């Protein structure tokens, strides 16, 4: 497993990462400052399966953030925390605002700017961390002809290209959900096709940890 004793993992992102965490940065166990999403599940699994490793999990997600917003606070809420590992999960609102607020272009982040924002954050992260996770944005819409799904796929592709270019760990949440929805309807996870319930949080945590050499069956 790639996370070592004493490592700190900072998860940055939007509401999908935030999920009720303490803002701007949440960590610890009292009153669930890590929120109720995939970050909480990841820490649960790390602690229960690797209790001998003191791994510090930090949630730096803020609801409503676009890549522009996250970049503006990246130095303060991510880099300054001296993380060993950084996860960047952003882009859903970059796309969503184009559909739920089409008359307000100042809230939109288009593909070229998304690529620039992601590039700058990845370059900052690579300078200070052992490793960087690039998590794709997603929409829980299996119909690839859906307009918002087609747009989201453009941003997912940018993540794939940047992860390869900068040798980051790619966590493809869109592909993970697509596989799940071959068996279950998206309403099982989220009525708005974005914010996951506990089943979705568990799926996302499992997908993330699958990239980390995590062993659920190791003896303690």
Locate each region found by the language model.
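Short glycine-rich His-centered loop
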Residues: 2-32
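Alpha-helical cap/lid subdomain in secreted, periplasmic
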Residues: 2-5, 36-56, 65-220
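Conserved active-site regions of diverse hydrolases
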Residues: 29, 33, 61-62, 207
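Short glycine/serine/threonine-biased micro-segments
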Residues: 11-13, 18, 59-62, 89, ...
């Amino acid at each position: 497993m790639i996370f070592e004793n004493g490592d700190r993992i900072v998860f940055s992102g939007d509401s999908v990462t935030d999920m009720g965490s303490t803002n701007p940065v949440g960590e610890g166990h009292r009153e669930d400052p890590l929120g109720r999403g995939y970050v909480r599940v990841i820490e649960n699994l790390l602690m229960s399966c690797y209790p001998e490793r003191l791994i510090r999990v930090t949630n730096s997600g803020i609801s409503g953030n676009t890549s522009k917003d996250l970049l503006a606070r990246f130095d303060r809420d991510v880099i300054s925390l001296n993380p060993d590992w950084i996860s960047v999960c952003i882009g859903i609102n970059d796309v969503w605002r184009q559909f739920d607020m089409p008359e307000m272009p100042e809230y939109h982040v288009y593909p070229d700017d998304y690529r620039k924002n992601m590039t700058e954050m990845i370059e900052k992260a690579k300078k200070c961390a052992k490793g960087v996770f690039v998590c794709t944005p997603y929409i829980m819409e299996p119909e690839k002809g859906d307009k918002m799904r087609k747009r989201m796929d453009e941003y997912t592709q940018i993540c794939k290209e940047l992860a390869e270019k900068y040798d980051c760990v790619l966590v493809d949440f869109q592909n993970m959900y697509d596989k799940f929805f071959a068996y279950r309807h998206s309403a099982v996870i989220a009525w708005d096709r974005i914010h996951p319930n506990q089943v979705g949080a568990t799926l996302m945590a499992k997908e993330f940890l699958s990239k980390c050499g995590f062993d659920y069956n190791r003896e303690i």
